Amino acid sequence: MNIIDELEWRGAINQQTDEEGLRKLVEEKKISLYCGVDPTGDSMHIGHLIPFMMMKRFQLAGHHPVILIGGATGTIGDPSGRQSERQLQTLEVVQHNVDALTAQMKKLFDFGGNSEVKMVNNYDWTHEINIIEFLRDYGKNFSINSMLAKDIVASRLDTGISFTEFTYQILQAMDFHHLYTKEDVQLQIGGSDQWGNITSGLDLIRKLEGHEAKVFGLTIPLLLKSDGTKFGKSAGGAVWLDPEKTTPFEFYQFWVNTDDRDVVKYLKYFTFLTKERIDELAVKVETEPHKREAQKVLAEEMTKFVHGEEALLQAVKITEALFSGDIKSLTADEIEQGFKEMPTFQSSKETKNIVEWLVDLGIEPSRRQAREDINNGAISMNGEKVTDVGTDVTVENSFDGRFIIIRKGKKNYSLVKLG
């Protein structure tokens, strides 16, 4: 199947401006296409992956993706999908975020070979345009009536929208025009909330370059979970691509915990597995859901794609250790990843009796309860049961002098940091 057929099978297309024309174009030649992201933060989250996975699919099909980092538009703020004004950021913060997002993109895309990916920053061609040029060369081509009718603006008319954010769609249209004339970009991809911005770009190109210009727009559906909530959030908030914000273990766990009703959809959206392999996994979901094979494959594919093979192996190792309760083989760094969200306590490195120590930390409510739990075999330290109420806790019991893990019962873990 060609790239458009594949995207349709994966359920990845929401709207497109000219399906027949785009299908014909990609069959005739390898095209350049672009997708942009504004540096509103110093990391992308998994919601950002959706359009960029599509870009990656085009790359694998031999087409030429152009990734735009919005160093200019990021200083303005996209009103799409928002009920209020964005807080303007300083140029220094924006540049820091540009650098961080650029580094993340370089991990996701192959920047060499026959289907080379280009990275551009719209600040490079926008910052020298003065206000007179902006109004004469670009503003003249936009009707206030049509701009007000765009959903991104119309939804904000009651609550208010600044002139700054109102003109955002012009800046994005200028980007498409620039990339069309300088990089031969003929297709823009974006989320479902970008339809108005994308069509503004198409209109501008045709006004400036002629109606025969072959340019297209394509948006991706808003991805909702089976319970109707928006995809991309965990109990702890957004799931980030930055391993300092969301560890590879947490990232892996997010995908492993996917609902049976969603996992096949996610395999289509996010992985590069073949239709045959996904169909096999879909059968497993129906016939052997308890094995969660589809979820494990999804988690493996995504963790490897974003964080690499080594981080995947580490995430699997931590998962297996937590499941079995055998955590002795873990390193201190793996302990830090795996127990990040567990109840955490602080202790000195001073040697103490286990009963006194558990009560002082607040893990046990009383000495009597601590002794009872130890005598009943309910307390484990670093994966080994504590059987003697006279046991001393020393720094030698810790992982690399940093952590001690206490398990009370079968599942109640606590992380004790020494310092």
Curated annotation (Swiss-Prot):
BP-aspect Gene Ontology terms: tyrosyl-tRNA aminoacylation
Binding residues for ATP: K233
Subcellular location as annotated: Cytoplasm
GO molecular function: ATP binding; RNA binding; tyrosine-tRNA ligase activity
Residues engaged in binding L-tyrosine: Y34, Y168, Q172
A GO cellular component entry from the record: cytosol
Domain S4 RNA-binding residues, every copy: 352-418
Subunit structure: Homodimer.
Name of protein: Tyrosine--tRNA ligase 2
